[in-house]
Amino acid sequence: MFAIKVEVGDPKAGAFAFARQKTMYGGRRISVGDTIFIFDSENEGGSGLIAMGLVTAAEAITKKPGLARQTPPVSITVKRTAQAKRRLGRSELKPFSHWNDGRPETELNFKFYRQATNKIVGISDETGAFLRGSF
């Protein structure tokens, strides 16, 4: 399973296209048929978790030549399968900062908010189950 933190143009849309997204923590392995949880980036005025979806297209993008350190970018298209029923964003996850406690909230805080950049990340099954509780 995967999660993405990104600026979402229309949070109510039935489908989303995210071009050239940074990947970390196994995010580059995303592929068609994967479940993804969409967080509308608070850095751009979003509200955190807004949707769960199914990846309908995924394409690895060639890295830019001449850059020594870069994560492999990916473009994806996602069909919304559910709308979040409760708020889950930076303020709800911030208290979970004991990085080795194994909690799903801590995994999300670490992967999304320790570095504020938008990105696609791989998540554990436990974190996926936790996120499903928001729908």
Segments (PLM) and residue ranges:
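Short beta-strand-centered aromatic/proline hotspots
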Residues: 48-60
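Short coil-to-beta transition motif at edge beta-strands of beta-rich domains
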Residues: 27-41
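Residues that form ligand- and interface-recognition hot spots within folded domains
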Residues: 40, 59, 82
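Short, surface-exposed beta-edge/turn micro-motifs
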Residues: 1, 32-36, 48-50
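Extended, low-complexity, turn-rich repeat/linker tracts enriched in Gly/Pro/Ser/Thr and Asp/Glu
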Residues: 44-46
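Contiguous surface segments at macromolecular interaction interfaces
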Residues: 1-3, 10-25, 62-135
